[in-house]
A protein has these predicted regions:
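Feature representing long, continuous alpha-helical segments
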Residues: 25, 36, 60, 64, ...
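Rossmann-like AdoMet/SAM-dependent catalytic core
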Residues: 198-205
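ATP-binding pocket architecture of kinase catalytic cores
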Residues: 1-80
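Short, contiguous acidic/charged loop-to-helix segments that flank catalytic cores in large enzymes
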Residues: 1-5, 50-57, 119-121, 147-153, ...
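Regulatory N- and C-terminal appendages and interdomain linkers associated
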Residues: 9-12, 32-33, 98-106, 215-242
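Active-site acidic catalytic loop and adjacent metal/ATP-binding pocket
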Residues: 36, 114-157
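Active-site activation/catalytic loop segments of kinase-like enzymes and analogous catalytic loops
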Residues: 156-192, 206-223
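An alpha-helical support segment within catalytic cores of ATP-dependent transferases
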Residues: 74-126, 193
Length: 242
């Protein structure tokens, strides 16, 4: 059940994407007390397909999905990119792991300096583009969830969100980790042809740092090691361009 203002805004977003033939859930019904019923997407979540045999999807189909977002998305309210809050997230992580303060300060400085002066962007964006939101089938993208975050921004923000999430997956065995590295090695060069490679990595690192707050907040049994691995991933992204 959604508050009235949020309900109307969410309904309008679904209607906008339906009219543009974006493969997102369709509105199956609404109630007077603001319940919204959506159709189920076909295919499988990318988060599962990543670890199944075969190619889950192509990088081109991921970019193509974002290209289907209609220009009217840019008329919606703007959401701040993760990189604007990198100092905040660095402080949160450092509060849990004080010995990482210097590394985090360095990363925040490089990200902020590297992205300073870039315009906000006026491209249609999803706003939270990661493997849990994307559905795939037969090696192609077939749907996208959680469209309430759509709005204007930079394409690099969406692609960076996906790269960051894939770079920080936890609880993988060695074969799964190898597969993830291979997927990233195949996808990122395609993303680099669409957005600036330096911007992509800096924004990816910023998203990764925001994800580094998760293990401590959820009190994972091995939260320290998990947090450190995410910090390492963020630093590796930065070191590719710094």
């Amino acid at each position: 059940m959604l508050r009235d203002g949020i309900f109307q805004a969410t309904l309008a977003r679904h209607d906008l994407l339906t009219r543009a033939s974006v493969p997102s859930p369709r509105v199956a019904g609404v109630t007077d007390d603001n319940l919204l019923f959506l159709t189920e997407l076909p295919g499988r979540p990318l988060s599962k397909a990543l670890f199944e045999p075969g190619n889950p999807c192509t990088a081109e189909s991921l970019v193509g999905l974002l290209d289907q977002l209609p220009p009217q998305v840019c008329e919606l309210p703007r959401r701040s990119p993760w990189s604007e809050s990198v100092d905040h997230y660095c402080r949160m992580v450092a509060a849990a792991m004080p010995d990482q303060q210097d590394r985090l300060d360095r990363m925040a400085r490089i990200i902020s300096q590297g992205l300073s002066g870039l315009p906000q962007g006026n491209e249609p964006t999803h706003g939270d583009f990661h493997e849990g939101q994307i559905h795939v089938w037969n090696g192609q993208v077939c749907g996208i969830l959680d469209v309430d975050t759509i709005g204007p921004g930079r394409r690099a923000d969406d692609l960076a969100c996906l790269v960051a999430h894939l770079s920080t997956v936890q609880h993988m065995n060695s074969s799964q980790a190898d597969r993830m590295r291979q997927i990233l090695a195949g996808w990122v060069p395609v993303f680099d042809t669409r957005v600036d490679p330096v911007e992509l990595r800096l924004r990816s690192a910023a998203v990764a740092i925001s994800l580094a707050t998760g293990p401590y907040r959820s009190q994972e049994a091995n939260w320290g090691a998990e947090t450190l691995s995410i910090i390492d991933a963020a630093e590796a992204l930065i070191n590719q361009v710094a």
